[in-house]
């Protein structure tokens, strides 16, 4: 059974939350493209887990925060929501901007043991010397496809062919993303050094053809953790869960199985 409702987080933010499945909990966090970009992951995990998939405030036509919140506000709000519900050993998975939120949540979980596993998929959120994050806002439709996908011709979207309501959602999503992550651009200057304090093993999955944040960026991101594994997904770009879903889900399943054995 799938249920979607609006929840109010402890810091006053509201988010649309979809829940499905039963079992150990998992939180799946989308990036700038919205919840559709992680829908396949959520559906897969819901076969064996209780999966929570929020739509971040301001995405897909939902209300934007009135005041400043940023990624830190989302991370704090989601973590507190899990804690208030008594959820423990949560597998947290984040794609792109969602990976940044997930990483921020992990550094905040300093004793409650709420988070039991961490998977970052082509995440942003840190500054890596020599590996700048591509300015997504400066790209046209072709540029987005070329930087985001291994096979851009297959996935390029012509804005003229997008229905008006969906185009409005996309424009609103970009406005919200710019508001919460545009300055400093797509990173927290303090996050990289804090990752060494994360207490759970992390898996960082990266599309080999990602030109938004390159595999070299991802490898450096992984090295900042005390315990992390870095895996490259062949023939995929910034969204390997869309271009190579089978390989991406297999990597997540293998990581989760190791996590079960570790905690069992």
Provide a role label for each language-model segment.
Residues 41, 200, 214-223:
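Short alpha-helix in the alpha/beta-hydrolase fold that links the catalytic acid
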């Amino acid at each position: 059974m799938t249920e979607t409702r609006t929840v109010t987080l402890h810091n006053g933010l509201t988010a649309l939350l979809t829940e499905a499945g039963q079992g150990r909990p998992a939180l799946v966090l989308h990036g700038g493209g919205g919840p559709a970009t992680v829908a396949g992951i959520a559906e897969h995990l819901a076969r064996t887990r209780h999966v929570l998939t929020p739509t971040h405030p301001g995405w897909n036509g939902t209300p934007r925060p009135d005041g400043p919140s940023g990624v830190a506000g989302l991370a704090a709000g989601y973590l507190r929501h899990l804690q208030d519900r008594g959820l423990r050993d949560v597998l947290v998975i984040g794609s792109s901007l969602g990976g940044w939120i997930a990483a921020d949540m992990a550094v905040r979980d300093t004793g409650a043991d709420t988070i039991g596993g961490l998977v970052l998929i082509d995440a942003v959120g840190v500054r890596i010397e020599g590996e700048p994050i591509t300015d997504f806002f400066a790209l046209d439709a072709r540029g987005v496809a070329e930087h985001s996908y291994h096979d851009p011709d297959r996935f390029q979207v012509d804005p003229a062919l997008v229905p008006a309501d969906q185009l409005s959602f996309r424009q609103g999503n970009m406005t919200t993303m710019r508001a919460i992550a545009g300055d400093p651009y797509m990173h927290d200057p303090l996050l990289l050094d804090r990752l060494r304090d994360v207490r759970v093993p992390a898996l960082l999955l990266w599309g080999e053809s990602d030109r938004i944040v390159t595999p070299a960026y991802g490898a450096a991101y992984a090295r900042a953790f005390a315990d992390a594994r870095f895996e490259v997904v062949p023939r995929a770009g910034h969204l390997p869960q869309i271009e190579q879903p089978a390989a991406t889900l297999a990597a997540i399943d293998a990581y989760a199985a190791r996590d079960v054995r570790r905690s069992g």
